Amino acid sequence: MTHRCRWAPRSFVLALLLAVWFSSCTIPERRSASGTHHHSYIVYWPPPPNDQEICLAVKDNIDVKGVVTSAGSEYVEKTGLPAAHDAACLAIARERHVRIVGKTNLSEFTLSPSGINDYFGTPRNPFSKLHQIIPGGSSSGSATAVDRGMADIAFGTDSAGSVRVPAACCGVVGLKTTFGLVSLKGVFPVEPKHLDTVGPMGKDVAHVVQGMDLLEKGFADRYAKAVANKPSGRQIRIGRLYLNGTDPKIDKAIDEALARAHFQVVPLAQDFRSKWDQAEKDGNTMAAAGAWISDQQYSLKWGVRARTKAVILLGRLLYPGQYNGALQRRAAWQHTLHDVFKKVDFIALPTLQVMPLAIPWLGNITLLEIRVLNVQNTVAVNFAGNPALAVPIPVVHEHFPVTSLQLIGRPLSEAELLDAGRIVETASP
């Protein structure tokens, strides 16, 4: 079964041609870096031996005072100035004297769903064996850092899936927060007016709860209340969304996980699926146009990768016409979700339609990026602004022990989402 194409055809083809052309004409410089952290970090400050403090990793598009915020870019690393202040989202962590152990790797300007970074190196997916598997982007280093135990919690950003996709690829937990909940001051932008969010990642739900408590004061108490209100899955009603193109093994794993958790599960109607598909397209349009609005000054800079330039130039083709058209449909999509959440507590679907893809030994990476973009089920959530949780669940597969369940909630339902994630996690064998 073929996957959905979510880009305007002419713009898509032009962007592809640009990327293929430029990629074949440039040889990227590679920054030398220690392999001890598997490229998870751009800057790493290892904690002392036997340190008992919470270790927090921060994606390198979030300002840390005194450090250049590279946004995953050679050009910015070499020309940027150290941040004069911490990003606002670090305020609680600083108040509590949480140990920040480094700035994590990411896709350049957060614009790649694969997590590949030609300059800083691509973080190694823990499931890589004979073939290197994509770590997922753009918060690739944040996902691999918590998986490898090099941080207890990592902060990532999510404009179109950039927390949930790497969480899915690397088998960790990632939370996309409600749009506007966490301040974006001091965060390198993609589309900050409608899409950009900051969210926590961890090896399990408990660590993500800790991460949310560092982003929102009083969150731990709200989470405890959510657990007390609905301690079991039998009290939670789930709307199950099935999407064309999904690997049957993944759908089976999700249905089994929901059954083990004893959720009340009801299938969502075909009409909702059609609206979801349109929201995915509109969200992608806004993300690409946002890249042009935020990053157009880098489109001709030496040191910015050709694939990144292609995405920025694609945004130029989509802005303002298709961008404004998508924006006009946003309220209707939010209303559609609002109506669904009158009937269910959460929506469940795969984070990715297929298992994480291998990085080709030879061939154009642009084609890989396009394929990843077309198998992630994340952008419609950003388009609406709702929160969503990616949590690993067991799967019967020859190469991967887990796949990723995505749960979508009402605005500001992060505590309830994590309670549902806890139930799923506890029910896993």
Q: What does each of the following model-derived ranges do?
A:
Residues V13-W21:
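Bacterial N-terminal signal peptides
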Residues E53-V76, D282-Q334, A390-P401:
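Short helix-loop capping/hinge segments that flank enzyme active sites or metal/cofactor-binding pockets
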Residues S24-P82, D86-A87, S107-S112, P356:
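Short, well-ordered alpha-helical
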Residues L56, I62, V68, C89-E95, ...:
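Gly/Ser-rich, acidic/histidine-flanked active-site/gating loops
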Residues T2-V13:
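Bacterial N-terminal signal peptides that target proteins for export
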Residues I27, R99, R148, I153, ...:
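Structural helix-boundary/capping segments
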Residues S294-F383:
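Serine-dependent amide/ester hydrolase catalytic core
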Residues V76-A83, P123-G137:
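Short pre-catalytic strand/loop immediately N-terminal to key active-site residues, enriched for Gly-Thr
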